[in-house]
């Protein structure tokens, strides 16, 4: 029956996908990429001895080992209360780690072939709320991109003076429409 064959083809493709994925993560190269003891203390300090730094260092190691797509998270940005204290802790950590990732990839000759993107799922309200935080705001937010052959030092688009709406070259996604 054709339906049985379609199911069989789909299951076979799924099996192949899972086997390929397992082969990738269980390979010698992957094990070595995840072995952070191979990095010098100086390099670990350069990225930062915190979640942002060590995750971005691991991301570089994965790219270096040939992984074609790396996604990392650095949570704790949902600051509905006391945004100043939260941002004063996380902002410098993220800034150090991201800047180091970009310069490290560039120094290793990997930046032009690696597109690095940093984004959030939405922006934050332009005004501080009653709890000294900011709430979800999908109308305006930023994405930072580097490498992958894109021009350096460019800014695309802008918001109005109060960051309440896109002003120049707005980009939309179906998620936010």
Please place each PLM-identified region on the residue numbering.
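Ligand-binding pockets and gating/stacking loops
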Residues: 3-175
């Amino acid at each position: 029956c054709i339906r049985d064959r379609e199911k069989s083809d789909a299951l076979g493709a799924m099996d192949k996908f899972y086997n390929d994925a397992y082969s990738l993560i269980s390979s010698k190269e992957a094990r070595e990429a995840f072995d952070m003891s191979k990095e010098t203390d100086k390099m670990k300090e350069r990225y930062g001895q915190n979640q942002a730094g060590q995750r971005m260092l691991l991301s570089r190691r994965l790219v270096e080992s040939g992984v074609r797509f790396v996604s990392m998270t650095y949570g704790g940005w949902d600051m509905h209360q006391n945004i100043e204290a939260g941002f004063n802790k996380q902002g410098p950590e993220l800034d150090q780690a991201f800047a180091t990732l970009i310069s490290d990839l560039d120094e290793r000759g990997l930046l032009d072939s690696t597109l690095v993107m940093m984004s959030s799922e939405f922006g934050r309200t332009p005004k501080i709320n009653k709890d000294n935080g900011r709430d979800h705001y999908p109308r305006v937010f930023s994405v930072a991109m580097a490498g992958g052959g894109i021009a350096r030092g460019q800014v695309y688009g802008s918001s109005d003076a109060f960051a309440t709406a896109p002003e120049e070259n707005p980009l939309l996604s179906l998620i936010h429409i």
